[in-house]
Amino acid sequence: MGKKYVIGIDYGTESGRAVLVDLEGNEIADHVTPYPHGVIDEVLPESNVQLEPDWALQHPGDYIEVLATAVPAVLQKSGVNPADVIGVGIDFTACTMLPIAGSGEPLCLKPEFKHRPHSWVKLWKHHAAQDEANLLNEMAAKRGEAFLPRYGGKISSEWMIAKIWQILNEDPDIYDQTDLFLEATDWVIFKMTGQLVRNSCTAGYKSIWHKQDGYPSKEFFRALDPRLEHVTETKLRGSIVPLGTRAGVLTKEMAAMMGLLPGTAVAVGNVDAHAAVPGVGVVEPGKMVMAMGTSICHMLLGTEEKYVEGMCGVVEDGIIPGYFGYEAGQSAVGDIFAWYVEQSVPAYVKEAAEKEGVSVHEWLEKRAAAYRPGETGLLALDWWNGNRSVLVDTDLTGLIIGYTLLTKPEEIYRALLEATAFGTRKIIDAFVESGINVDELYACGGLPQKNKLLMQIYADVTNREIKIAASKQTPAVGAAMFAAVAAGKENGGYESIIEAARNMGKVREETFKPIPENVAIYEQLYQEYTKLHDYFGRGENDVMKRLKHWKETARAVKESISLS
């Protein structure tokens, strides 16, 4: 048997990337395909339909474009014979969901529905279902539902049930016309194989499904809304299969589009962050993996099911078979830094960066690195896109305290970096307080590759050594590992994801170790962060929510005046 390869495809927020990997984990070729429609958060494509605040949609055709463009590109770059590619795996943002017709076609691609916002793909960071999430949490708490503690006491507006309920409330006809609500990762697998299966990872973390208990009861859904009573057996029906399972094989049509052979094994869909865990070789407890990009997803393995405040979920076999997989997260990290650079940095900084031939981020990082912890005099709350963990509240907003007339852009930039590190520390503390050890940190994604200052701050704030993924595209490599498992040992792949991870997972030799004097200062700053966190986030002062309410009211008045 000659040398064999697998392909992993990582569907991110703005683009999809394919990586061709050998069975030792060496990356042979990769290609990034930006989504032609990007994130749709203002106006629907091909119409002038304006979207409300907190909406975030996508075009499902963009996902197929990635298959048609990125996969042939890596084959061409590498010169690898398609016959030597034994499997394909994908990972996706989640919960990114869409309504499909009985034919499997997304409703938004039908001419009669394309002007209806609720027919489109709802991206993970669509936060307009917060009202539904609030009511769902109130009802679950009132009824003492057993599932609630598994999700840190709150179900997020980002997840499947809240999004489905929003559709039912705001456009019941779309709900009625929908045959199935699917995670985008499962829909792409369906397009590739013709097989409709749901993966246990998104079902468990995003759709309140439990390996032993299944979905919440019909009685619970009836108490929420009588129209939802049968939602799990109708709109969410379908086989739920574990990670590492073969979903099917490439159809002739999709194989031709992708430049591969019909019959190539396709792994069950996965979540981007979760695929990264084996991607860095982590297959045992005590090692937290941080997938760091526009947001952060924190993942940890355990040997038993425990309840942790504000975690996104604990799912048996949800990350690595044989372990309970814990997930927590921060709703915005890289997005905060990007917002600052794009919206708030003065012109002279951009001009100086251009003159030096560096990006604005690099210019700010270099200058921010000259400051000692505490030297900026600033402290921030990292809630520009709400708080996912531990407060689970998308109505919270960002805050910076300590401004003076002498405050410089690089000081603000550093304060934002530090704020996200404090947010991660808050998550680590929640796990440790619940009896789940966090001994080592692993980081992957775009941020650890680009920003050394950020990683040193995280090491200092958490007082833990951080190991960095060797790959710049760890989720795609992880997806490729699952492809190797789907292909099976008999075809040159692996028997289990643990075996694949031990042979294919890689980290850099360079690590970030905490600096004791920095740790001591950050400990004091973290105590102040905690006071602000609890004051604004736990109900003592709901000013952020009131401001958001007044903003929405003012906008509504303004729109009604413009329409009259």
UniProtKB/Swiss-Prot annotation:
CDD domains: ASKHA_NBD_FGGY_L-RBK (cd07781). SUPFAM superfamilies: Actin-like ATPase domain (SSF53067). Its EC number is 2.7.1.16. The keyword Signal does not apply. GO terms for cellular component: cytoplasm. It catalyses: D-ribulose + ATP = D-ribulose 5-phosphate + ADP + H(+); L-ribulose + ATP = L-ribulose 5-phosphate + ADP + H(+). Keywords: Arabinose catabolism, ATP-binding, Carbohydrate metabolism, Kinase, Nucleotide-binding, Transferase. One of its GO terms (molecular function) is ATP binding. It holds the Pfam family FGGY_N. Pathway: Carbohydrate degradation; L-arabinose degradation via L-ribulose; D-xylulose 5-phosphate from L-arabinose (bacterial route): step 2/3. One of its GO terms (biological process) is L-arabinose catabolic process to xylulose 5-phosphate. Transmembrane segments: none annotated. Belongs to the ribulokinase family. HAMAP family: Ribulokinase. This is Ribulokinase. It comes from Anoxybacillus flavithermus (strain DSM 21510 / WK1). The gene is araB.
